[in-house]
Curated annotation (Swiss-Prot):
Organism field: Rhizobium johnstonii (strain DSM 114642 / LMG 32736 / 3841) (Rhizobium leguminosarum bv. viciae)
Source organism superkingdom: Bacteria
UniProt keywords, alphabetically: Repressor, Ribonucleoprotein, Ribosomal protein, RNA-binding, rRNA-binding, Translation regulation, tRNA-binding
GO molecular function: rRNA binding; structural constituent of ribosome; tRNA binding
Function: Binds directly to 23S rRNA. The L1 stalk is quite mobile in the ribosome, and is involved in E site tRNA release. Protein L1 is also a translational repressor protein, it controls the translation of the L11 operon by binding to its mRNA.
Family: Belongs to the universal ribosomal protein uL1 family.
Gene Ontology biological-process entries: regulation of translation; translation
Quaternary assembly: Part of the 50S ribosomal subunit.
Gene: rplA
Record keyword Ribosomal protein present: yes
GO annotation, cellular component aspect: cytosolic large ribosomal subunit
Protein name: Large ribosomal subunit protein uL1
Length: 233
């Protein structure tokens, strides 16, 4: 039964064809028929080899229409900065006590922020937070004195991205319940951020392939130029 359902969902999607962005979004939304609000994800295959330091792609982007998901934020801070984080809506705020909780394997948050003075302490959590992509980093604005701004950005649609070993960068950019225009704006914002993060060591064609999909639906390949405005060299 599940196989027939999958076959029906996949009907009309040509895996060899590149679709215009607006058409691809419509196709993905039509096929997001699960009983929950499926996440829409975009993936970009880049012409980089992240094994080389000068070809790493990493950054953060504030999606104009948010992600549609509730983001739980933890902040490592003391004193006035801890109070600032709480006032901004942080879900968990602490210092040594929060380190102990995380070391004990209790990670009840999706994003982690720290003030610079807390990093020697937070550094102990590298083996726990690093593999999960949660380690605070000044390059993506999660090591900062502006904890209120970072908390609000995290809860308002900030998405971190980092290229994987195969040269792929991907992110959830909304929900199937979003209208097509909102999804298109989010996808373009994400693509723009990835292009701006193009490393100096990247040679040749930078954006090789782009595709979008829903949680349970098929991937729909997109003409890169319809996302980037022009083929990225």
């Amino acid at each position: 039964m599940a196989g027939k359902r999958t076959q029906k969902i996949n009907e009309g999607v040509d895996p060899t064809k590149l679709y215009a962005l607006t058409l691809a979004i419509g196709m993905v939304k039509e096929r997001a028929v699960a009983k929950f609000d499926e996440t829409i994800e975009v993936s970009m295959n880049l012409g980089v080899d992240p094994r080389h330091a000068d070809q790493m792609v990493r950054g953060v982007v504030n999606l104009p229409n948010g992600t549609g998901r509730t983001v739980r934020v933890a902040v490592f801070a003391r004193g006035a900065k801890a109070d600032e984080a709480k006032a901004a809506g942080a879900d968990i705020v602490g210092a040594e006590d929060l380190v102990e909780i995380v070391q004990g394997g209790k990670i009840e948050f999706d994003r982690c922020i720290a003030t610079p003075d807390m990093m020697p302490l937070v550094g102990r959590l590298g083996k726990v937070l690093g593999p999960r992509g949660m380690m605070p980093n000044p390059k993506v604005g999660t090591v900062t004195m502006d904890v209120a701004g970072a908390v609000k950005a995290s809860k308002g649609g900030a998405v971190e991205f980092r290229v994987e070993k195969a040269g792929i960068v991907h992110a959830g950019i909304g929900k199937a319940s979003f209208d097509a225009k909102a999804l298109e704006e989010n996808i373009r914002a994400f693509a723009d951020a990835v292009i701006k993060a193009k490393p100096a060591g990247a040679k040749g064609n930078y954006v090789k392939r782009v595709a979008i999909s829903s949680t349970m639906g098929p991937g729909v390949k997109i003409e890169p130029g319809s996302v980037t405005g022009a083929p990225a060299a």
